[in-house]
């Protein structure tokens, strides 16, 4: 299949991560997957949710949103509608679940870390970019409060799919919109699965195709883990 940006089927978009993008946040990163750009801010609070107050542990959570002009046409802010959409809630729960797999919460007793992921420009893969960039922001925040030992694993995510019967890595919006199936895969740096979200949009896909998609994602995630490590080391 001919990809509009001339990428090979197994090639990531150009990916960059700028750490410490926001001087106010304990940890932050601006992540770019091609034309998808997301700001991830990690804020540390010396408190835990009420339901955790009797437990010797900490908490990591996430919020997600898209700026009004992050897409082709302006969207109304969800705050003006009075509630978040089901899509937004689903995505921020996914991000939170994924990032909690990066840390040992028992080493964060008394702390809550909130990762805010704000999409400033969207071209597919905003949730996977949020997880990958959010991990760097979380790591930088833990360095700031000298809790780096709480990190268990780096976590990253990528999308894969089938378009015109061909497997593709890191779908942009056009590819995602026309995919027969698309799958979001979250792994840790040991290449263990954390979460898989997959849908046969136009047709069902086989177990063999699913395995091939996971293998394709794994190869892309290896590159993302390498990038995360470089950014954390040199940032």
Write out the residue ranges for each language-model feature.
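Compositionally biased, non-globular sequence tracts
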Residues: 1-7, 75, 79-80, 151, ...
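N-terminal, positively charged regions that mediate nucleic acid binding
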Residues: 1-57, 222, 226
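Solvent-exposed alpha-helices and their adjacent loops that cap or buttress functional pockets
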Residues: 7-11, 21-24, 30-33, 52-55, ...
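Glycine-rich, charged/polar anion/phosphate-binding loops
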Residues: 15-17, 24-27, 45-48, 100-102, ...
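Structured core elements
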Residues: 16-18, 30-32, 39-41, 61, ...
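Glycine-rich, flexible beta-strand/loop modules in the N-terminal catalytic cores of phosphate-handling
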Residues: 29-108, 193, 197-215
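A structural signal for small-residue-enriched, beta-sheet-centric alpha/beta enzyme cores
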Residues: 107, 125-129, 139-141, 148-235
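Conserved mixed alpha/beta catalytic, RNA-binding, or beta-rich assembly cores of soluble enzyme
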Residues: 114-144
